A protein has these predicted regions:
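Core nucleotide-handling region used for phosphoryl-transfer chemistry
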Residues: 1-345
Length: 345
């Protein structure tokens, strides 16, 4: 799978009114709903630039000047600080709005690219990454025997929904923490990585992994991916009493393996697995999104869960298009909208 298309050319598939709203309406793009101004005069069939949530609209780019007063965040990119507005899920007039729609000519296009075209670079947009909460120096780039942890949202896979409903998948709770990868090379040396970088052996990530003996569960050529959660991490939104890992994927020689093949002890540290019948892929995309909305209590009693990740069983044949979208991770997610809006995400 290629890197995430933060900004792409998409076609508006529908326009819905908002009760009691004179100036705004809802545009449908893929599986997303985005609140837009009626003065944009958009209609079904129009091609537009769609910006996904987590997009950082840089303050130095005049195309995004109007957004900066809504709030800004700063992140480090290489040796530079970049400040801008980060797109989050919001609720307006009782309607969830996810992402941003702009006209292509607002971005400087004098022609209309095909639907699906990745225009992230042209839009000059970055994916916002929260600062690493754990200590430890970066000593190299991500080089583990696995893919970087990533799962597309179901809203981007609407064209494959009928195929997805024919496949077997394991539903697991998406746990809100810091993504970490632990691997063992062929010489038996253990390495630890953040989402994009290798960290030194004295990092807090490594120390916590060792505390739970994850390093002793690995074999050469194996990698375990997990969320580090608890006090001091991502505001501890799940209110856990202590820091701990939640394993969500295990790999051997760049191939993801099913949970029943994980090393002894690792399933005890896994993210919670949900009932496959209760969370079978049925109905419409909107039905599934609505079902996840409000999910709670699977990690911490009575607290909202972040969402669900469906991991496809590895022995299934996928169409070329779906395989390209999912990549080697072979999973996708639905995020709990109530969780997003409650936490300003």
């Amino acid at each position: 799978m290629s890197s995430r298309k933060l900004v792409s050319v998409q076609e508006i598939t529908g326009i819905d009114p908002i009760e009691g709203a004179d100036r705004i309406e809802v545009a449908r793009v893929l599986g997303w709903r985005v609140v837009i101004g009626k003065d944009m005069h958009l209609k079904p069939g129009d091609r537009v630039a769609y910006f996904e949530t987590d997009s950082l609209l840089p303050a130095y780019d005049p195309r995004y000047k109007a957004f900066q007063e809504r709030g800004q965040k700063t992140m480090i990119v290489g040796s530079m600080e970049v400040t801008g507005h980060v797109l989050r899920t919001v609720k307006l007039r009782g309607v969830y709005s996810q992402g941003l729609i702009m006209r292509l000519d607002e971005l400087g296009f004098r022609y209309t690219p095909p639907v699906g075209t990745d225009i992230t670079d042209k839009a000059n947009v970055l994916k916002y990454e929260e600062p690493l909460p754990m200590g430890g120096a970066q000593i190299g780039r991500f080089d583990a025997p696995c893919s970087k942890s990533d799962a597309p949202r179901l809203q981007t896979l609407t064209g494959y929904w009928d195929e997805l409903k024919t496949l077997e998948a394991v539903p697991t709770v998406k746990v809100d923490g810091t993504s970490t990868t632990l691997s063992m090379d062929e010489r038996g040396q253990v390495h630890v990585y953040s989402r994009n970088w290798e960290l030194d052996s004295m990092s807090s990530n490594m120390q916590l992994a060792k505390r739970f003996q994850l390093d002793k569960m690995l074999w050469p050529g194996m990698a375990a991916q997990f969320e580090l959660c608890g006090p001091g991490i991502q505001s501890n939104r799940l209110k856990l009493p202590a820091q701990r890992p939640f394993v969500f994927a295990v790999w051997k020689d760049h191939h993801k393996i099913d949970r029943d093949q994980w090393p002894t002890g690792m399933p005890n540290l896994a993210v919670p697995e949900l009932d496959e019948n209760e969370w079978a892929l049925t109905g419409s995309v909107d039905d599934m999104i609505a079902k996840v909305d409000g999910l709670r209590g699977n990690v911490t009693k009575d607290r909202l869960d972040e969402g669900i990740v469906w991991h496809l069983h590895e022995d299934q044949q996928l169409s070329e298009g779906l395989a390209n979208e999912l990549g080697a991770n072979r999973c996708f997610k639905i995020i709990n909208n109530k969780y997003l809006t409650k936490n300003g995400l």
